[in-house]
A protein has these predicted regions:
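Transmembrane beta-strands of outer-membrane beta-barrel pores
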Residues: 49-55, 108-114, 152-154, 173-179, ...
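Predominantly the C-terminal beta-signal and adjacent terminal strand-loop region
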Residues: 40, 56-60, 65, 212, ...
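Bacterial Sec-dependent N-terminal signal peptides
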Residues: 1-42, 47-48, 275
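Extracellular/periplasm-exposed beta-strand and loop segments of Gram-negative cell-envelope proteins
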Residues: 60-66, 113-143, 178-212, 244-266
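Residue-level detector of the transmembrane beta-barrel scaffold of outer-membrane proteins
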Residues: 44-46, 103-105, 168-170, 230-232, ...
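Short loop/turn motifs that connect adjacent beta-strands in outer-membrane beta-barrel proteins
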Residues: 38-41, 82-101, 154-166, 225-229, ...
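Residues on the lipid-exposed face of transmembrane beta-strands in outer-membrane beta-barrel proteins
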Residues: 47-51, 75-81, 87, 146-150, ...
Length: 276
């Protein structure tokens, strides 16, 4: 019976998360359609894949082993509103600075990172060191959001020139649904307090998951592949408004080293196709 209850409970969490994602996607679609009707623009769609370095309560801040070890993979789908070109008339829009230098990006993305404790404290041959080495985790995050991208060079000129480069800066907000799995490989797992690093007692770990807002900031460039397609490369920083994304959260009032919420750094590349 316990197994059935756990299964149904997890199933309920997945269904609730799916409903929220569908609702947010409908809001984004509605916003895009509204802006299309009011302003007129063309559409671009694409996909990307890349690596993620997850910075969390696992490991030690500014430690190479932590930075190199707690890495995962991210994938995503993107949609762009291109204000420089109107699809309905197959013509350029009025030449304004905004139309020629900004795009709005909508995104659905997913990243997953397996997490471990690295660094000087986990390397110690003590009970505390063994507790840290045995503690593992995984952060799985689904994002829905938008960002505004600024292109310093002319979007019109880039669109008309094969082989051109178009650097950009981006800033936006995502709503993030996270699922974490924190556990210990020691007999009895984290249910046995003797297996838990003291600074995570009594309630500094969780596998419940949840959702939170996050802010994203990026720098990247596009490369004009053909008249209707681009490649793009992007380095992105994402900061969550929660410290539970990784499943660990030491009490910041007691442990001053817990200075920031969870965040990650993405590097990915992708392909973009112009629909109109």
């Amino acid at each position: 019976m316990q197994f059935v209850f756990i299964y149904l409970s997890d199933n309920g969490k997945i269904l609730a998360m799916t409903k929220k994602i569908k609702y947010l996607l409908m809001l984004l679609l509605g916003a895009n359609l509204s802006m299309t009707a009011q302003f007129g623009f063309s559409h671009e769609v694409g996909a990307f894949v890349g690596g993620v370095a997850f910075q969390s309560d696992f490991g030690v801040r500014h430690d190479f082993k932590t930075n190199a070890g707690n890495t995962g993979i991210g994938v995503g789908l993107v949609h762009y509103m291109n204000f420089a070109y109107r699809a309905e008339c197959n013509c350029y829009t009025p030449e304004t600075y905004f139309n020629d230098h900004f795009k709005v990006r909508s995104e659905l993305s997913y990243n997953s990172t397996k997490l471990e404790h690295f660094g000087e404290f986990a390397d110690k041959q003590t009970l505390a060191g063994a507790q840290l080495r045995a503690m593992k985790g995984e952060a799985k995050v689904t994002d829905v959001g938008m960002q505004l991208e600024y292109f310093p060079l002319s979007i019109r000129e880039f669109t008309a020139t094969d082989g051109a480069w178009a650097p950009f800066l981006g800033l936006g907000a995502h709503y993030s649904f996270f699922d974490n799995n924190t556990y210990s490989t020691l007999p009895g797992g984290l249910g046995n307090p003797n297996n838990v690093y003291p600074r995570y007692l009594p309630d500094g770990f969780s596998s419940e998951g949840g959702s939170t807002w996050s802010v994203v900031s990026s720098v990247g460039t596009r490369y004009k592949l053909t008249e209707l397609s681009d490649l793009f490369f992007e380095l992105r920083w994402q900061y969550y408004f929660s410290d539970w994304v990784d499943g660990l959260n030491k009490n910041p009032d007691l442990w001053k080293e817990n200075k920031a919420n969870d965040w990650n750094l993405w590097f990915h590349f992708g392909y973009i196709y112009y629909l109109d």
